[in-house]
Amino acid sequence: MTRLRDEFPVLATCVYLNSNSTGAFPRDAARVLAEYGERLTRWRDETWEDWLAALRRYHAGVERLLGAPAGTVMTDASASALLGRFASCFDYRSGRPRVVTTNREFPSTGFLLRAMARYGLELEVVDVERDDLAPEAAIAAALDERTAFVVVSHASFATGALLDLRALARAAHDVGALLVVDAYQSLGVVPLDVIADDVDVVLGGAHKWLCGSTELAFMYVRRALLSTLEPAFTGWMATDAPLSFAPRSAYAGDAWRFACGTPQVLPALVSQRGLDLLLGVGVAAIRAHSLACTARIVARCGAEGIAIATPPEPDRRGGIVALRFPGSQQVQQRLLAAGHVTSWRGVLRIAPHIYNTFEEIDACLDRLIAERRAAV
């Protein structure tokens, strides 16, 4: 643990429990940034060959994380851009105009899908906060043979609540629809195996649990689907040989077909170290540590009478514990002033990662409970 913690300078400055918002950044990034600057000062066009190879190395790391075959991951600046590119592959004026999502998604999903109504997309937003129906059952009930795909978050960005992806994949595939999973809030802290879970598309990004840079997102697409998907939102990079600068006659044969313009090289370069560190630890070990940490938070806050918005069941709980009480935003700010970094999104979110200790969690909870009592 000490050696791992030494990789992240922020841990020497505070109690950092905010990896669901932005993960701790490895110290190796400074070296990578310097090397990048040096390459720019002695530019040669051949640098692009090295940089595209670096992008493919990052893709390979994400594929390893997902248990995915080679050539099934592509990166871009944001998950929104990649979801838009995927959504642009469909003719919504044909027999499958419907897209289903939930009221638990990060706002970008709804923004994008509603905007595509002009192309014939019919959006249905399922209420998964009902007391009378499990979220998976509510989503399954909304699917039919007119559904092109369903977009769900593996873990809620607000509470960390997990969905059963295998159950949702069965429900989607039973009606001929595809399952698209936003895993931004789970990858790196909760295992996701695209083969075992039978998912079709996974979206994620580097700067949260994967301890990387902003402006780097990625999308996995099931290999068997690749040849059937032709994005309308595309660009010069979406070929097998973009550096030939030839007029495009065909999309790339692999996930590179979801490229667009000039790719996000620097974010991938500085994000590689964080991804490598986490792969070295292994997601199973990270998940075990995360569950032990979040169980500690749930038990302590529950004993204090604090309302917990995160599901208490381990198999329903992602990497976040979300707390709901009057004055929680002010308490979050006072925690920050005292050197305990958490986040607030309508609830106070505590998000321990593999580099956090029980002692740090206890110290944060001591302060949180004291601040809450003082505010009552």
Located regions from the model:
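Pyridoxal 5′-phosphate
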Residues: 1-376
